[in-house]
């Protein structure tokens, strides 16, 4: 039984169940969830003398660990950003104006001071919509708070909320224009960023308007199924991350149970290598954050459904790869299978290397011919799955964790590059 709790300021006070109820009812507004069940689950998980933030975190975990619906993600997201607002602006959420926020960060040397007129500051302040933070899912808040908003690298305390980050970037871009165009441009760019129509490069979030003055730097890396290629890829990820680059990686590796070393070893799959990429990228800090990597995987991969879920907060912690970004690749043949609601073949690159290579070619007929040959060859291990099931899994993760998509054939048809394109980068 919880009798006392510790507040944010360190003081102890009697536990007030009505406050827990208030948090749960507030987070559930217009969502229609069983907020009582969520609050009770949080209460059962915490002990006497816990912190109030522990209770909020327990409610978040009750949503994202045990449930995967959009409503639960929104419920948890509201609790998360509510906690951020409490830490930044106090119990009454005394949110500063855009000018007050900017001047505060400029005084600390976090951002470069911008020189708008008082009238412009008032107009800009009318643009920002803080309520949009309450409409973001938990997975979005976690990603933004870890990667994109400015923070004190020593204490970990955030300097800004998502909406303040969007307006900061918009103001910096607009400050380079003529006075008469500045406020209009702030509004246009803020709307694009805040409504998620435009996804800006990660370095922009971190550097725009700050003394760092860095610009995006992007690298793509191709890894094939050999020890030498793996070694070179891992070294490249480490070196590029140390130099501030965002990295797009395509790993064409064997799948679980594929033979290794003349059938003396069974392959363990891609997870360990993805985890190594993640660790090497995070080993080097870029303005307080780790390096950023986007893993590209395809519709042919036997692990496709598992890979799609590795970023999700509901995935077990020992498997979860929360700090990597993922992009799903497919071609016209896969789209046909989705449209026709037919089966789709999953096969390892070890058994069908030519098919995997043709996935990146614009010639649809060549791919289909090789696809049918591999499918008919009974000596090649494979499995058939409904194409719509694969796409459904990927699209669900796109909504929950901002997963991306690319079209392997189209990006090699509509291109000025002579070399085959295997991956891109979020920048």
Model-assigned labels for residue ranges:
Residues 1-427:
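Extended catalytic cores of very large enzyme megasubunits
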């Amino acid at each position: 039984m919880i009798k006392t709790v510790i507040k944010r300021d360190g003081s102890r006070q009697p536990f007030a169940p009505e406050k827990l109820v208030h948090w749960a009812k507030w987070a559930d507004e217009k969502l229609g969830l069983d907020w009582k069940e969520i609050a009770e689950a949080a209460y059962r998980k915490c002990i006497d003398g816990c912190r109030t933030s522990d209770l909020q975190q327990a409610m978040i975990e009750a949503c994202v660990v045990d449930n995967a619906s959009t409503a639960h993600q929104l419920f948890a997201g509201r609790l998360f950003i509510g906690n951020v607002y409490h830490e930044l602006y106090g119990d009454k959420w005394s949110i500063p104006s855009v000018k007050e926020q900017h001047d505060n960060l400029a005084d600390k040397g976090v951002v470069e001071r911008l020189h708008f007129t008082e009238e412009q500051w008032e107009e800009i302040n009318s643009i920002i919509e803080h309520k949009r933070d309450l409409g973001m899912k938990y997975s979005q808040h976690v990603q933004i708070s870890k990667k994109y908003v400015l923070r004190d690298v020593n204490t970990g305390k955030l300097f800004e909320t998502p909406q303040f980050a969007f307006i900061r970037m918009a103001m910096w871009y607009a400050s380079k224009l003529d006075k008469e165009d500045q406020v209009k441009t702030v509004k246009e760019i803020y709307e694009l960023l805040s409504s998620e129509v435009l996804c800006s490069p990660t370095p922009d979030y971190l550097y725009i308007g700050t003394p760092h003055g860095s610009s995006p730097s992007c690298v793509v890396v191709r890894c094939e199924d050999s020890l030498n290629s793996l070694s070179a890829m891992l070294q490249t990820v480490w070196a590029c991350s140390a130099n501030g680059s965002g990295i797009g990686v395509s790993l064409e590796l064997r799948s679980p149970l594929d033979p290794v070393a003349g059938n003396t070893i069974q392959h363990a799959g891609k997870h360990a290598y993805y985890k190594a990429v993640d660790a090497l990228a995070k080993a080097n800090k870029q303005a307080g954050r780790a390096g950023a990597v986007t893993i590209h995987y395809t519709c042919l991969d036997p692990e496709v459904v598992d890979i799609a879920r590795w970023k999700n907060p509901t995935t077990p912690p020992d498997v979860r790869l929360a700090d990597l970004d993922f992009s799903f690749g497919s071609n016209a043949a896969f789209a046909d299978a989705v449209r026709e609601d037919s089966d789709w073949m999953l096969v390892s690159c070890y058994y069908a290397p030519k098919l995997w290579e043709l996935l990146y070619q614009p010639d649809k007929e060549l791919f289909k011919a090789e696809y049918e040959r591999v499918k008919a060859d009974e000596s090649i291990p494979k499995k058939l799955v409904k194409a719509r099931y694969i796409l459904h899994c990927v699209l669900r993760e796109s909504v929950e964790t901002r997963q991306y998509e690319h079209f392997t054939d189209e990006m090699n048809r509509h291109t000025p590059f002579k070399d085959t394109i295997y991956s891109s980068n979020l920048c």
